[in-house]
């Protein structure tokens, strides 16, 4: 009988751990958006702060997939618009700066930066 209780307790512990990590990963999940609409021969700049005058961290061409943190200027949260059609999502961020998680040096040193939403589409 003791083995039954130990097995049940172990199964519940594993299940609760899996559920905790599942919920946690959903809360911290990044949304993938793609760079698009940048003029030929140009790139989308990632800035340290949400401003054209801010320090440039990196630049990405059309087709690059960026990982968004979900936070945009104007109080916009990408998780709140995630269920809408792509055109409505794009329209919502068109004039906003959105935060990305990227690796400008491509050495595993990920940092946050800001990109202008006009050049992003949901991926």
Q: Predicted segment positions?
A:
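Boundary regions of SH3-family modules and the immediately adjacent low-complexity/disordered segments
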Residues: 23, 28-33, 55, 84-123
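Beta-loop motif signature
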Residues: 31-32, 38-91, 101
């Amino acid at each position: 009988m003791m083995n039954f209780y130990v097995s049940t307790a172990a199964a519940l512990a594993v299940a609760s751990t899996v559920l905790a990590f599942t919920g946690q990963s959903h809360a911290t999940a990044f949304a993938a958006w793609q760079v698009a609409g940048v003029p030929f021969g140009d790139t989308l700049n990632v800035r340290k702060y949400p401003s054209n005058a801010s320090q440039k961290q990196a630049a990405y061409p059309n087709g690059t997939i960026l990982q968004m943190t979900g936070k945009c200027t104007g109080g916009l949260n990408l998780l709140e618009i995630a269920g809408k059609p792509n055109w409505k999502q794009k329209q919502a961020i068109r004039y906003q700066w959105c935060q990305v998680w990227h690796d400008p040096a491509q050495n595993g040193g990920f940092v946050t930066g800001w990109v202008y939403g006009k050049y992003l589409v949901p991926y």
